[in-house]
Structures are given as C-alpha cells and as structure tokens.
Amino acid sequence: MKLLNDSRMQEFIVNGYVKVKAAFTPAFHESVRAQVEEIFSTTGNPGNDILPAIPQLADLFSHPAVTGALTSILGPGYAMHPHRHCHLTPPRQAGQRHHQDSYEDDQNVRHHRTRWVMAFYYPQDVNVEMGPTSVLPASQYYTRRDQAEKQEEVLLSGEAGAVTIVHYDLWHRAATNHSDRNRYMIKFLFCRMAEPNAPSWQCASPVWSEPAAYEELPRLWRSVWNWHLGNELRDDGQDDASRVGVSAGRRDNGLRVEQEVLSEAGQLENVYQLSGQGPKGSAELCERLSKEALELLDHNQAARHTNPSQLYSGFGLSAQGATAVPYLLELLRTGDWPLRAAVADILGDIGRPAGNAVPFLIDSLDDDSEWVRRNAAEALGNIGSAEPVPQLARLLVKDSCRFVRHNAALSLAKIGRDADAASSSLQMALDDTNLYVRENARLALARIHME
C-alpha cells in the first residue's frame, strides 16, 4: 500500500482532491472501457450495477496506490458505498454547470472533516478536448456558488488508470466534449468507518505548512489537519481580523465582533477564530447558532438535497470539540426542532470527544422531528459508543422514515463488533424496502462478524 506523505495529505486538505495512478497494463483499462461501451450500447447505464457487471473493477480499488490514498484520507477500514455511477459524455455534448453532489439517500450536512470521498476513474486516456471532469480546487468548504466559482477551474485530464480521490463536497462538473469519442468516468463512493486517533498516512511531521497558492482559510485548514492527526488542537484565534474577511468593529473582551462578513470564506474563518476562544467562544457560537437555525431554515429547505442544519456556527462548535459539548446539550434540551437537529449534527461532527452526549442523543432518537432523529442516529455512529446499540436496532426496524433507518444501519456498521446485539435487527433489515438500508445492514453484519 502506497500511503500519501505529509505534502500530499495537506494538498488534499487544501485543494479537495489528489490524483493517483492505478498502474495496471493498458489492456486492463481497455478491457474495462470496452465492457462499459458494450453495456451502454446494449442495456444502457448500469448505475449501481457497474461493479457486478464488470467485476475486474474491484481489482482497481485493491491497487496499492488507490488503497493507500483512501487509507490516508479515510483511515483504515473504510467502506465502499453501494452507490456508484458511470458517467458518459458523448461527442459534442455541452458541459455541466459546477455543482456539489448530493449524498446518496440522505441530505447530509456538508462537513469539513473528511468522512466521505468520491473516486473518479478513467478507463481510457482523457485529454482536455474530450470533456474531462473539471474541479474548482479549494471549493469543498463552500456552499455558495459565487464563492466556489472564485476558484480557478482545473480540468482533470489523464491517462487510462487515472484515479482522482475527491472530497465529497468539492464543486465539479463534466466539461464539454469537443472530440468525436465517448468519454467515460466511473464514480465510486467511500465512507470513513472510524474517527481518527493517529495519522493514517506517512506522517513525518505534525506541523502544518501554509499553502502557497491559497490564503483564505488558514484556521479551517489547520483545524482539519489536526483532526486528521487525531488531535483536538486549535489555534489561539488571535490573528488580525483583516485576515479573516471581517471589519474589526467593536470587541467585548476580544470575543464579540460587530462584523461585516465580506465573503463566505470570511464567515468561515470568523467562526473558526471563535472556536479558539474557549468557553466564551462556545457561548458566542451557540448564540449565533440559535439565531441561524431559525433565520436560515427557509433558505436551507428551499432547494433539493439540502439539510436544515447547514449552519456556519456549527463548524466553529465542531472545531471546539469537548469544550462546546455542555453548551450544546443545553440547546438540545431546550431548542426548537431546527436547533435540536443542528445540535445533534454538531455533536456527531465532534465525534468521540462528545461521548458525554450519548445519553442525550439516545433520547433524541425518539424526537418527533424526523431531522432530529436522522442527525442523532448518524451522530451516534461517529461517536462510536456501544451504549446506543439497542436503540439504533429498534430504530432500524421500526422507524417509518427510511433516512433514519439508513443512518441507524450505517452507525451500527461503524460501531462494528460491539453492535453484535443488533444482529437480529440487521438481519431483518436485509429485507427493507430501501436498497441503501439493506446494503448498510449488510455492511454492519460483515463488520460485526469480521475476524
């Protein structure tokens, strides 16, 4: 297995993608391309069935360069998600608009910490004329198109066997195919199954190196780097306000800022700045969160594939780790449903340091709000405690919402062997009406019983 080094790992954190080469023979990739072409011409796009239709694709994701990159980014024991797709751009087809992919069968909050990635594989040489996949580097932390499109587009041309590992939220598109040849790209999804407790790449130094090409999100990048290291380190938040895209304004004890947010980047850097200010920062961020949860609700629910818990303050609270948990638990007890849902999500993004929240998240599994139950079920898997296994098992077979069942099954898979008591419920879930609930249950059973 060929792990990433510090430089390439930091490149991924900043740019949102890293390219590797599955160096099989040209005949291997040509065989895949020919089979894809045959399938499209006879039965159409196979969707999720591309892997059983072309079993040799499994060899691709066993290649040392590919497994090394995925292990470096997602940690050991990562899982291939059952959703996959083969993208065809025929000759002369116009390019797409830049977009972020929706999360398959759940509208997850877009998080900065890397728990999901995509892998883009070319089974043939793709030059710039053929409409390669295009990415906007360093755009994965933005939800606003106007901010993302400030980044300079990069066309991912490459030889057959090129595999690009992409942060799930990176803005991307298929470019225009100006050639007379079909262009194929096969997309696979991968999911982190355990929170980091040490570097999973070839780490020579824990020191973060500021990138030369970008400068807008230094605190965010350092926070994500430290999370990947398995640390809860935070910077002190004392940089000059001009570095984070806010006007200086009035400060109360160096905390409260009467700010004019100049950009989404500035807003993100501001909440990461507050994350470094201890309990005072927690109080300020929770106050903002309470307002955002209601003020942004209509906006967050207006479009498809969105989550009402997509709130800027949540990123700062996640970065605070255990410091923020007591403040969040108070909101979980007292807030309206949009706020309760946001808090459940943030506790899950904090992960293991939010272990004290487990009993409260278990209670949230019975919340009247589907969104609270969805986010609480997901959060418990990230925290990884075995305590909620009986409640997650009950949810898996009894909750009427497929998204809740989906998240319950995936969380049981993350808990792994300690979820053995849920085995009978997981067996029942193999007959669920939803494909992804069934597949997550299958994954959970495999992880419970793996040697």
What would you call each of these model-derived segments?
Residues 158-172:
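Conserved metal-binding segment of the jelly-roll/cupin
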Residues 175-259, 263-274, 278, 310:
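Non-heme Fe(II)/2-oxoglutarate
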Residues 227-248, 265-280, 299-322, 327-330, ...:
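Structural detector for internal amphipathic alpha-helices that build alpha-solenoid repeat scaffolds
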Residues 94-157, 200:
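Catalytic core of non-heme Fe(II) oxygenases with the double-stranded beta-helix
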Residues 256-261, 284-304, 327-335, 360-368, ...:
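Alpha-solenoid HEAT/Armadillo-like helical repeat scaffolds in large eukaryotic proteins
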Residues 1-109:
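Non-heme Fe(II)-dependent double-stranded beta-helix
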